[in-house]
Structures are given as structure tokens and as C-alpha cells.
Amino acid sequence: MDFITINSSNKTEEFALKQVAKQATSSLMYRLGKTIILASVCVEREPVSEDFLPLVVQFLEKSYAAGKIPGGFVKREGRAQDFEILTSRLIDRTFRPLFPKDYRYPTQITLMVLSHDIENDLQVSALNAASVALFLAHIAPIKSVSACRIARIDDEFIINPNTSLLNQSSLDLFVSGTKESLNMIEMRSLGQKLNALEEPLMLKALELAQKSLKETCTLYEEVFTPHQNELLFKESQGIIFNERLLDLLKNQYFDEIIKGIESSALSERENVFHEIAKKISEAHSEFSLEEIEWSLEKVKKTEIRRMIIQDKIRPDKRALEEVRPILIESDLLPMAHSSILFTRGQTQSLVVGVLGTDNDAQTHESLEHKTPIKERFMFHYNFPPFCVGEASSIGAASRRELGHGNLAKRALETSIKNKEQVIRLVSEILESNGSSSMASVCAGSLALYASGVEIHDLVAGVAMGMVSEGQDYAILSDISGLEDAEGDMDFKIAGNLEGITAMQMDTKMSGIQLEILYQALLQAKEARKHILKIMHEAKEKIVINFSHLPTTEIFNVAPDKIVEIIGQGGRVIKEIVEKFEVKIDLNKPSGEVKIMGNKERVLKTKEFILNYLHSLDQELEQYTIDEVLEAQVKRIVDFGAFLSLPKGGEGLLRKQNMDRCQVVLREGDSIRCRVISFNKGKIALDLA
């Protein structure tokens, strides 16, 4: 294959254009070291009639890319893994704001990882491969985009670190954008400590990222512009509104429109605007319902922006920096290890905490790791339809739910002191009017504390928004659902009083300037201080019920005794677990026994196991080498027979000893035998 080589931002990327998958609108083979990704873009020639951007992004990992066969019973890639879904979202969120507002051609971007050497960054590589493929497709006047990752090791920022360096970093900052501005950010702190990053340092990291993106995007445009397809879709002038209808709305229905804007709940607001549209349609048949709805949307959006930018007042009458009222309740669910109900305005999150053992950890297979990894801290976010007043069934977790859960997990992960502890937090969104993921962070942090988990500090989250008109703009703290829908930016920021532990930024514009982002960071810090003050007050009222919380008892036995605790076919350990209602983890090489459950049951289980092993030792002590016994055949196995001994316990008569004497045994037979050895707590027998 012929490759085009581009050197920028500490990496050498290679692109083979239009040599594979040639029936796609555009395709390329991307190579970085030993990592190879096939990127393709396919576009349907007929636009859809619905009012949405029909863009689909699929990032797919192939097990063979790392020389592996898929684990599990079915040896074929199946349902998408979380990493694949999150990476698909990452790329989708980068490109979506760059498309023209009235682009309606079904478009699919597919990225297949064909080879991966573990050291190279799959997400940066996939986004860059997708960016060039989309640029070559030339389906719309879309700017060149690129991505970079910033790490921080020993107070020094590093652009595009490899996996080994990232594992040493206290910062994981992923940024994508054009050469002029940023349009997507994902950040989390890393390490054993909280490692919250202060706002001035965050700005410095973002400036470094912007410089990297500018360099890469400029090179992409210079190198790949000659290879672009013919432009498929030219941006139109947009919707042409009927001025008479707009005047009608402003003069006769303006008060009703304001009432709809000021309605807090999404369902209530939709009902108000539906009634307005229905009323106008009945009174003025010369206007179509679609035309009325478009015009209503325009008047609504214009008025919301005017209120915020000119009057400095928001639809719910809050000031720009004002956070909605907060109410926190704890210990609502008596059988869970913790439960926190966090209500902020009309957004309500119930976070439930449960502690577990190593067996409860989620195991993942990944191209990024040679062996399956254990996820010990899990955060699951659920967004049932009733939380926004919708009547529909609850199904499997959506991409959005996975993304919000992942964001909350990233925000809280470094606040946990003991990284070996297995913890599951579940956020049930009971009511939503914006910022539900950040409500989940606040409730989740308190739920960790209420579960008896040692944390470095409480972590709070707030969603920031922005509304702009020309050069004028306003930044909003703790945005509502309406402000999120009608605004230009959704900037979620979580952290403590010292700095930021996680953030996520999406925009509906082609990008956001750094000075606006920095202002949002500083404004978010003030909001965070306010929220943390309320959270600390709530924390003081939480009474941790240690008697109800599971406790863990760890002790060691001789490694060869572990098989005795397990028993034949797991019989003994199953009986212990069922009898005492505990969880047990056993480590054969070290002899470590870990018991988890109710404190009283755990102590009784430990006592039972030690007494059981002691009784086995006593049984062995009753016998001596060369002692002749009258034993009874208990059970026949492939390798011999287990015999019940007269003074208790059992011994093994191996098959070769039986064959040597040409003896055929049945269960229940009595036989004379001789003790020949003691091996790892077992009695070996021979025929006497």
C-alpha cells in the first residue's frame, strides 16, 4: 500500500487513501506504529424528511487485532463493549456540531481496529482517522478536525503520551477541535490521590491542546484537500420564515409563548407549545402546522437568548450564576448499604451504594490490556422515561446512559482511597430538568461516604451553559433542560474546592474559544463551592450503620489447605456460603481467605473454617505410617478410590495400586489397607 505520512504532535501518522473499501463514499487505512484502523464514510443520496441529523458513528474492536480469540462460549465478536460505545460517542460528539443545520443525508462513519500494539492511543487514532475520511468524503463544507491527549507527569504536560506514560500520569485530558477552536473535551484525574487540577493549570493544558490541534488540522487540510471528493451537499440558506406568521406570534401569542418558556417541566412546556400551535392552525388555515412549529421555535429561541444576554435573567427567573435550590436526604433504603436522594430544582437523583467482593468486580476484555481487567468501582446511570414525563418502556442501557455513568465514575474514582475495594453505585434519575449527570456525581460522592468507604474528599458537579449572539455571550451556572436545549454549550465540571477531577464539554457551535472556557471554569468553581457547602452539611447528618455494612475479614491458612475449604467439586465451600450467607474469596497460591458479609456472620464463618481445618488435622494425627486399617470404599473415581477410615477422615487408594494387585472394588466394599504417606493433608493408602 502507498501511505501518506504526516508528522505532528509527537506522532507519525500514515494514511493509505482509497485503496481498500473502495465502494464507500470515502475510505482509508490509518497506521500509527503497529496500530491499524480502517475508516470509512458512507452517505445515502436521498435525504430524510425528519428534522434531525442522521449521523451514525461505529467504532469496532476486533480481537484478532491483538492476536486474541474472543473469550466466552461464543468465539465471535458480539455486543459492543463499553469502550467501543464510549469511543463512538466521543467521535460523534466531535463531528455533530460541524454539520450544516439542515443536513439530512443519512451518514455512517465506521472505524474498525484491525491491529493494535497496546502502546498507541486508540481514541486519538480513531478520531483522526475518522476526521480525514470525513474530510475526503467532502459531503458538506466541514472543517478539518483532529484530537490529542494531554498527560501530566511530575508537573510537566505531555502531548499524546503512549499507554505506559499515561499510566504514570495524574491527568487524562482528551480534546478535539478545529484549528480555530475546541468543540469536545473529556477530562479525568488519575492516580492514588484525588489529583484535582486547578483552573489555571487546566487552562494551560487546554492551550497546549489547542496548539497541537492547530498544527495537525493545518497539515491535514494542506495534504488532503487535493484528494477530496466533489462537494455533495452545499449549505442552504436555511428555513425561510413567513414574516406575517412571525408578527402574528409576537403580537397575539407572545404572552402564551412566555408562559411556555417559563414552564419548568419539559412535558408541561411541550403541552403549552402544542396547544399554541394547534390554536393558530385552527384560526389560520393558510399556515401549515409544520410552518407554525418552526416559527414558534424561532420566536421561543430568540426570546430566550434576548432574556439571558440583554436582561441577564433566565427562563426560571434565576440570575446567571445562581444554582437551583438543593435538598439532600439519606438512608432511604434500609437494605442497601447506602442511599442518597439529591434534588436540585426539578432534577432528582437517587444513588444507591452496594459493597462487594472480588468476585463481584466486572471483568472486561480489551485490546488495551493483555489480560482481562477487573473493574472494581462501577457507576451505573439509569434514565427511565417517567423522569421526563414520557410513557414508554424501560429497555437496555442507551449510549447516553453509559456515557453519563462513565462521566460520574471518572469524577469520583480518584476520591476513593482503597482502590481494591469493590463498589457499585447506581443512579436512578427520578426527575430530570437538566444536569442529571452532575446530580449523580453529588449524590454518588455522599453515597460513598454513607457506605463507609474512605474518601479523600467530597466531589460535586455542576453543568455550565452558554448563550451567544454575535460577539455577546452569557455563561450560565447549573443549566436547566431548556437552557441545555436552546444554548450553545454543555460543559459539565466536577471536583472539590481545590480543583477539577472530571469534565466533559460539548457544543452546538463549530467550537468554543479558550477565554470563554476559562471564564466558565472560574464560574463553575464558585457554583461548586456553594454545592459542596450544602453537601458537607448533609454529610454531618449521615449516620453510617456499620452493623449493617458488610465487613471483610482476611486471614491466611497453609496454601495446601485451600483445597480442603473448597471440597470435592466445591461441596464444602458451597455449604459454608449457604449456611452463613457470606461471600468468600480464596487465593490458592498464597493461602489467603477473604470473607465478606455481616460482621457477626463473618466472624462465625472464620471460626467455622479454622475449626474445620483443625478437625481434619486431628483426624490425620490419629494415623501413623504403615498402620494397617479396615476401611470402606466411599466412592470410585477415575484415578482410584476414596476410602472411609475407621477413626474418621478418608484416604486415597490410587488406581495403579489396585491394578497391581488386580483388585476390583465397588462402593460399600470393606478392604484391608495400609497408610503409606501423608501428602498436603491427604492420606495415601495401599492394599495391605
UniProtKB/Swiss-Prot annotation:
InterPro entries: ExoRNase_PH_dom1, ExoRNase_PH_dom2, ExoRNase_PH_dom2_sf, KH_dom, KH_dom_type_1, KH_dom_type_1_sf, NA-bd_OB-fold, PNPase. It is found in: Cytoplasm. GO terms for cellular component: cytosol. Residues 550-609 form the KH domain. Its EC number is 2.7.7.8. Keywords: Cytoplasm, Magnesium, Metal-binding, Nucleotidyltransferase, RNA-binding, Transferase. Mg(2+) binds at D484, D490. Its cofactor is Mg(2+). The keyword rRNA-binding does not apply. Its main location: cytoplasm. GO terms for molecular function: 3'-5'-RNA exonuclease activity; magnesium ion binding; polyribonucleotide nucleotidyltransferase activity; RNA binding. Residues 626-688 form the S1 motif domain. It catalyses: RNA(n+1) + phosphate = RNA(n) + a ribonucleoside 5'-diphosphate. One of its GO terms (biological process) is mRNA catabolic process. The keyword Iron-sulfur does not apply. Belongs to the polyribonucleotide nucleotidyltransferase family. NCBIfam families: polynuc_phos (TIGR03591), PRK11824.1 (NF008805). PANTHER family: POLYRIBONUCLEOTIDE NUCLEOTIDYLTRANSFERASE, POLYRIBONUCLEOTIDE NUCLEOTIDYLTRANSFERASE 1, MITOCHONDRIAL. Involved in mRNA degradation. Catalyzes the phosphorolysis of single-stranded polyribonucleotides processively in the 3'- to 5'-direction. This is Polyribonucleotide nucleotidyltransferase. It comes from Helicobacter pylori (strain G27).
